Amino acid sequence: MARLLTSSSALRWRTITSSQPVLLRAYSSGSSDTEYLQRSIVPTMHFQKSLPRLPIPKFEDTIKRYLNAQRPLLDDVQFKKTEQLALNFQNGVGKQLHEELVQQDKQNKHTSYISGPWFDMYLCARDSIVLNSNPFMSFTPDPRPEYNSQLIRATNMTVSAMRFLKTMRAGYLEPEIFHLNPAKSDTLTFRKLIRFVPSSLSWYGAYMVNAYPLDMSQYFRLFNCTRIPKPNRDELLTDEKGRHLLVLRKGNFYVFDVIDKDGNIVKASEIQAHLQHILSDNTPTPEFPLGYLTSEERNKWAVLRQKLLDNENEEALAKVDSAVFCLCLDDFPIKDRVHLSHNMLHGSGLNRWFDKSFSIIMTEDGTAAINFEHSWGDGVAVLRFQNEVFKDSTQRPAISPESCSAPVDSSKAVQRLHFNLDDSLKAAITDAKTKFDTSVNALSIATMEFKKGGKEFLKTQKLSPDAISQLSFQMAFLRQYGKTTATYESCSTAAFKHGRTETIRPASIYTKKCSEALVMNPSKHSPAELRSMLHECSKYHGQLTKEAAMGQGFDRHLFALRHLASSKGLPIPEIYQDIPYAQINHNVLSTSTLTSPAVQLGGFAPVVPDGFGVGYGVHDDWIGCNVSSYPARDVRQFVQCVHQSLDDIFSVLQDKPLK
């Protein structure tokens, strides 16, 4: 169910107007010390108590939106049947379920109606989390080449990550806010005033100046957190007492403290010495690398983990689970963006522990990325962490190329973990590796860069850059496969307490009409007609985006109603047994976008065997996408078709003839 109902990755925040959101600048009470990133005068969780609750949409609106999304995917006969089933649901059992969901929500004001079901969806999913769940986001290289040495960058990022941890736990991290009118709200005056507004009212104070605080409830699971495999439903374990870092190299596991017993960050020169010790260690790769087990089917991994515990590995596993995070040091450089994507999304499996809340992966040439487990949180929290770590490690690096390691005995400070494996566990690791290799070898990745224009030009044309990107995917799929297909775009609902994501459904009657005109018969339409169609697409996509960000999509509402029926042991309502319902949730095009100065590239695998996983970004003067597929689709041809589609759109906008 998880693969049918969610994109692999929810990597973005959508604003609720067309204004460009501005990330909160750090106004601190002075932060020259090396322990913290900043010392915000507004406490980190100041707005959390007063965040608005995620609304449950009106039931009739959900049904209407669902049918609008189905219209471009169905012929008249199919649509009539689906429409009737939807209306029957609206006037029958669905109405009762909706009323019960509303009542349940009123009794649980501390959270959102989607939070529990969403955790269930992720944690009950039994497929491997590799490819099916974990995405990656790679860091932009340090602008100074000499700082991209693996040892220097790993040390600096580790220190910056610990500064983030300490800043957050001390309440000094700037609250996450998006400013729609920065001149009014992104100011020291605003901060000085808002910090004195009681936390039960603070959100309203921000709202009055068009500033939107975001939910930060996921942040505590960034560190010391691991997904633990259990039969039928996994658990999230967070142990904030852990002061050590987990480092993987050549499939070997090492731990050393990065926070001392007084709660201070261990000296950067000592961290450097310990990492140098690990990089110099000539211990061979284990014959049976344990990390492969985290790529197993979850029920099988749960059984194997219990076997590990029974074989006296409890202490070693506890070290892995409670580590602040996982640092994977790979012994090779990155060749190109496709190699980067494969390595950061899955790698060889040898040097990974996919269950950690996040891992920083760093190759020999200093190329770095975050691979994160998705059940605990979404891209908003991870991106904030990535932005802060990139900024701090490049602007305030703890060590430089001239720095010397501390004269400490790292052989005593660094512990290499040993695991006792019996024959059945060795066989299980071999089996897991075989399955892992088969899965990842089936994945293809292709990248595309369109250099003829981007956000700036599209804005001069009064067009939404995201709408145009999504239209190019619709056109590309039509050009390649001759039809319109189910499309998913993830959208954060972090503007609400315990919000997660909502779905934007970019395939519409407008994109279908426009795609068919541009791809199949552009000569039948005047340039003015084609431009008018582009504006129709942009306007409707903007409406869908605004609705989704405000919790007014249809996907999560229908999902919650189905979850409620299932939890009550009721028969599955007919609407959910309708073939078009399964088809619209079989997301052939699963898409997610983000742009940040800290992020070079992001990506994820398709969520269905015959799908594409489309990570994309619209920059000032170019548009890029990083796309994955399995053998059922031709990803290289698809990215060529996307490029051709963007070419055609920009030609129309520039009054050039279509090729």
UniProtKB/Swiss-Prot annotation:
Organism annotation: Xenopus laevis
Family of this protein: Belongs to the carnitine/choline acetyltransferase family.
Boundaries of the annotated transit peptide in chain numbering: 1-27
Pathway: Lipid metabolism; fatty acid beta-oxidation
Record keyword GTP-binding present: no
Protein residues bound to CoA: 454-466
Any one biological process term the GO annotation gives: fatty acid beta-oxidation
A molecular function (GO) term: carnitine O-palmitoyltransferase activity
Membrane topology label: Peripheral membrane protein
Stored InterPro entries: Carn_acyl_trans, Carn_acyl_trans_N, CAT-like_dom_sf, Cho/carn_acyl_trans, Cho/carn_acyl_trans_2
Residues the entry annotates as binding (R)-carnitine: 488, 490, 501
Sequence ranges on the Mitochondrial matrix membrane side: 28-180, 211-659
Origin: domain of life: Eukaryota
A Gene Ontology cellular-component term: mitochondrial inner membrane
Origin organism lineage: Eukaryota, Metazoa, Chordata, Craniata, Vertebrata
Enzyme Commission (EC) number: 2.3.1.21
Known role: Involved in the intramitochondrial synthesis of acylcarnitines from accumulated acyl-CoA metabolites. Reconverts acylcarnitines back into the respective acyl-CoA esters that can then undergo beta-oxidation, an essential step for the mitochondrial uptake of long-chain fatty acids and their subsequent beta-oxidation in the mitochondrion. Active with medium (C8-C12) and long-chain (C14-C18) acyl-CoA esters.
Stretches within the membrane that do not traverse it: 181-210
Subcellular location: Mitochondrion inner membrane
Active site: 374 (proton acceptor)
Pfam families per the UniProt record, alphabetical: Carn_acyltransf
Protein name from the UniProt record: Carnitine O-palmitoyltransferase 2, mitochondrial
Reactions mediated catalytically: (R)-carnitine + hexadecanoyl-CoA = O-hexadecanoyl-(R)-carnitine + CoA; octanoyl-CoA + (R)-carnitine = O-octanoyl-(R)-carnitine + CoA; decanoyl-CoA + (R)-carnitine = O-decanoyl-(R)-carnitine + CoA; dodecanoyl-CoA + (R)-carnitine = O-dodecanoyl-R-carnitine + CoA
Keywords tagged on the record: Acyltransferase, Fatty acid metabolism, Lipid metabolism, Membrane, Mitochondrion, Mitochondrion inner membrane, Transferase, Transit peptide, Transport
